[in-house]
Amino acid sequence: MAADSTGSESTRTAGAVADADPADSAAPGMRAADVGRAARQDLQFRIPRMPVVRRGVRMRRDDDTWVLDGGRKSQVLGGAFARDHLGALLQACDGTRTLAQIGETTGIGPNGAFEAVSLLWTGGIVEEGDTAPLPDPQPAPELACLLSRLGDSTGVNDSWQDAARRLAAARVAVTGDADLVGELIGALDPTLDARAADAEPGDTLAVVLGTTGSPADGEAERCWGLGVPLLRVRIEHEAVTVGPYIDPGFSPCL
């Protein structure tokens, strides 16, 4: 179904994509036209310029609907647009086409493409494909897949490549019980270059490992004074408690 020059056809077809299954969606009945309208007005919406389907997720056809597998939540997209056009739209979201080109390729027009892609982005199905390639060595495929899938949960990075760049540039200090510090650093390698040391100004994160015999409260207070974000990890008996994450930039207290 091609979009007409007024955009009304694209709005109607894109709106049909958003008929989500109330049992599976956090926003039942959300329509692409509504999401697209919000995306044009809210700067928190960063709709991909050249969308690509996220790694580790799959849109599966089920009769007249499409089911999202691998996302942070189960979703079902239905309606006439989903039945007739969503397959072609997903194929066009390969990271090489702009929204205008996707609209032309699929016949839904630029407005319909914007609305439909806005919905797919809100649902964690697509991310930004217009990003600079990563330098060698490349991240492990498993890490790339994880970063892509988690991107929708955090909403911080436009693409998994952006997340990988931030991860590679991170300065992480791990402090606390010496034996546990060594084990954690070994587990993080080679995903993250962490060091066994007290936090220093400019660090991205300090992981503070506390035990019954070594509570590490003093190091947490030191991080707070330096303005370094910290993640508390408490190990006692047979339990491990991760959190809270404390950022002096917005956390009210330790």
List where the protein language model places each region.
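Long, charge-rich, low-complexity alpha-helical segments
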Residues: 2-28, 72-194, 232, 239-241, ...
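A generic structural signal for short, non-catalytic loop/turn and secondary-structure boundary residues
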Residues: 52, 61, 167, 246-249
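A generic structural signal for ordered alpha-helices
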Residues: 35-37, 64-67, 71, 80-81, ...
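Short, charge-rich amphipathic segments
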Residues: 38-56, 119-120, 218-234
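Long, low-complexity, charged/polar intrinsically disordered regions in eukaryotic proteins
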Residues: 2-7, 12-74
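E1/E1-like adenylate-forming module used to activate ubiquitin-like modifiers
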Residues: 2, 201-254
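Short acidic low-complexity segments
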Residues: 193-203
